[in-house]
């Protein structure tokens, strides 16, 4: 790989570089291919934890963004090595969405001022079982006896319209980066490949990745920034080794317990 083709990993860039308005195009590209509609970022919201050290517990940035209709807010873009918090991750993102809903409506405002929330989580740990690398969750109300979807009546621009509850309730995207193991063909797949490997195809036309090739070049950082970045990568490698070792020790312990149970059953017979 040529030196100019080395790009900064997204989990690092999102905390240190992509908060700058000049770099919003990178984030907008990811959200555009994920939501399948144009997204324009209005501002980056400060997070509850902007820890910048190698032993970060969280790597979280809150993003306020509009779609092409100016209707939505992207509340949380989560890219993290959640090494000790993964057992309650769903509860954590639920809390984050609930907090965002209340933060973005003032006391005394009407219910129609409640904003649509999209929660996007980029996961570098194993959250559970599943065959896909991208999962999408949203609320639907199904008839218990009929199985039909409920349409609710509401008012928009002085007109009475019907809409699905999913258009109002939060939506969740879980990107399981480590589960992606195919050749990237679509813009979304190119993005997942970059999230996993840090590599960007030189001929990419994927929204956001074109900008990333210009703005996230490793050697554009200062020597001090490169040192901090390299330390970040080393910390990740060490943590991953610890996790792999612990997982293997757990499997070996399970195998030993199984063999011992087998011997005991044999003696009893």
Predicted ranges, named:
Residues 1-269:
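Elongated, amphipathic alpha-helical interaction scaffolds
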């Amino acid at each position: 790989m040529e030196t100019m083709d080395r790009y900064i990993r997204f989990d690092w860039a999102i905390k240190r570089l992509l908060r700058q308005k000049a770099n919003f195009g990178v984030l907008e590209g990811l959200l555009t291919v994920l939501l399948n509609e144009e997204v324009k970022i209005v501002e980056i919201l400060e997070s509850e934890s902007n820890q910048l050290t190698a032993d970060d517990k969280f790597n979280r940035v809150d993003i306020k963004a509009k779609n092409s209709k100016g209707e939505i807010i992207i509340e949380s873009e989560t890219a993290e090595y959640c090494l000790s918090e993964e057992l309650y991750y769903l509860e954590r993102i639920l809390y984050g969405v609930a907090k965002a809903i209340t933060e973005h409506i003032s006391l005394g405002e009407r219910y129609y001022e409640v904003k649509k929330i999209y929660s996007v989580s980029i996961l570098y740990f194993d959250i559970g079982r599943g065959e896909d690398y991208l999962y999408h969750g949203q609320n639907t109300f199904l008839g218990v006896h009929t199985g039909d979807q409920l349409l609710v009546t509401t008012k928009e621009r002085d007109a009475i319209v019907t809409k699905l509850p999913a258009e109002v309730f939060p939506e969740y995207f879980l990107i399981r980066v480590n589960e992606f193991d195919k050749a990237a063909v679509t813009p979304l797949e190119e993005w997942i490949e970059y999230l996993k490997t840090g590599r960007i195809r030189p001929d990419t036309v994927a929204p956001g990745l074109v900008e990333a090739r210009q703005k996230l070049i490793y050697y554009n950082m200062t020597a001090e920034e490169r040192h901090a970045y390299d330390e970040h990568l080393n910390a990740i490698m060490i943590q991953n080794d610890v996790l792999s070792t612990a997982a293997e020790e757990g499997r070996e312990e399970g195998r030993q317990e199984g063999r011992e149970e087998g011997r005991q059953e044999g003696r009893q017979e």
